[in-house]
Amino acid sequence: MYLTNYILFCCFNAKNIGYFFGNYLIKKEVLFKRIVNFVLRNNSRIFSAKSVYDYILNEGYTCSINTVMNFINYLKEAFLIEEIKQYSTKVKRELSYFGKLYDMDVSSNSIRADRNRFDIEHNLENIVFNELIYKGYKVQLYNLNGYEIDFRCEKKSKIIFVQVAYSVVNESTYNREMKPFSLLDNSNEKILITTDKVDYSTSTVRHIELEKFLLQEDI
């Protein structure tokens, strides 16, 4: 957390910006700031370097996809973001071309919110991701027949599947979050994490309130 805040300070404080750019030999400072803001503001979303590249072109800047990838790698090296890949059931490996980016400090998104329009859903997913990493899990995206499960989590021989939602009080939201679970067998635990106080556990899915999840040593 302290390293993240320090890097943010160096990146965006006018008096210290030279330190960060000097270490990474970045010459296109304005372009770098644009990419940083875009990436940190779009956490917990499907990511590709091409999508960032297209955004930059649309903003009127010119650069190469390699430049975008290099800048994103700098953010990873500075522990500002973490990238996870999709787990493939067919080839039993990660799909290197498909993934999401998560902010190591979720406030990196909030301080960039437009007119205080905080992105609660994606930030909540980001918070759960950070906590799963802290609890020692290897975390991957999971897709089964076109239905996305937020996280496939593995630690030693333990595998769990996790869905995250702000609330499932609405029936359509509940059905959307639970549908992917119904396509899995029951050999591994399935967990739904929300802010709801009501217990939505079923015979095959365990519901955990967010606050309790954050206070647990493990799941």
Task: Describe every region a protein language model picked out.
Residues 158-170, 177:
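Active-site ExK catalytic segment of metal-dependent nucleases
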Residues 144, 185-204:
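Nucleic-acid nuclease catalytic cores
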Residues 132, 162, 181, 190:
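Hydrophobic, well-ordered secondary-structure elements that form the walls
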Residues 4-156:
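Accessory nucleic acid-recognition modules appended to NTPase machines
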